Amino acid sequence: MFKQLYKDNIVKSLKDKFNYSNVMQVPKLVKVCINMGVGDAATDNKAINEPFDNLHSIAGQKPVLTFAKKSISGFKIRKGATVGCKVTLRRNKMYEFLERLIYIALPREKDFRGFSVKQFDGHGNFSFGIKEHISFLEIDYDKISKIRGMDINIITSAVSDKEAKELLLALKFPFFDN
């Protein structure tokens, strides 16, 4: 549905709005990266299993484990220790995830009022965090031991933040005015 909405409506409206001469200049979604940090995994190897499975069910794709690049004694982390998991979504899985995120997970998020425009990075990419991964319907609340957050990065082909914001607004992303 999201992909069809983009092809049918959004491309035409963005092309007219920004006066592009070619359809290929219209910004599009490139990928969505989801990261779940698991600090407990540095000391307990089995602590990564549950978040790994949860991220797998949320994304619909097998995550990759992430490891510490260097040792940090304050966090009791050694170089090479498992510190989380991540997944990169492209094409159809990306659109399916964003649809579930916007219409199901974000409305269920506690105290969510919308995204800030300041969350753009200056190059047309958008990053935000979710405090509770149980907002997704794929997670069974009774089977989890700890509520975890996740970071979501949306990478677009937009040149500026203004173009990326218009693309995400057309996809029904909830922004609040600053």
UniProtKB/Swiss-Prot annotation:
Q: What keywords tag this UniProt record?
A: Ribonucleoprotein, Ribosomal protein, RNA-binding, rRNA-binding, tRNA-binding
Q: Which InterPro entries does UniProt cross-reference here? A: Ribosomal_uL5 (IPR002132), Ribosomal_uL5_bac-type (IPR020930), Ribosomal_uL5_C (IPR031309), Ribosomal_uL5_CS (IPR020929), Ribosomal_uL5_dom_sf (IPR022803), Ribosomal_uL5_N (IPR031310)
Task: Quote a single Gene Ontology cellular component term.
Answer: ribosome
Please provide, alphabetically and separated by semicolons, the GO molecular function terms listed in this UniProt record: rRNA binding; structural constituent of ribosome; tRNA binding
- Quote the Pfam families the UniProt record gives: Ribosomal_L5, Ribosomal_L5_C
Would I find RNA-binding among this entry's keywords?
Answer: yes
GO BP annotations listed? translation
Report the protein's function: This is one of the proteins that bind and probably mediate the attachment of the 5S RNA into the large ribosomal subunit, where it forms part of the central protuberance. In the 70S ribosome it contacts protein S13 of the 30S subunit (bridge B1b), connecting the 2 subunits; this bridge is implicated in subunit movement. Contacts the P site tRNA; the 5S rRNA and some of its associated proteins might help stabilize positioning of ribosome-bound tRNAs.
Similarity-based family: Belongs to the universal ribosomal protein uL5 family.
- Complexes and interactors: Part of the 50S ribosomal subunit; part of the 5S rRNA/L5/L18/L25 subcomplex. Contacts the 5S rRNA and the P site tRNA. Forms a bridge to the 30S subunit in the 70S ribosome.
Q: Which PANTHER family match?
A: 60S RIBOSOMAL PROTEIN L11-RELATED
Q: What is this protein called?
A: Large ribosomal subunit protein uL5
Identify the gene encoding this protein.
Answer: rplE
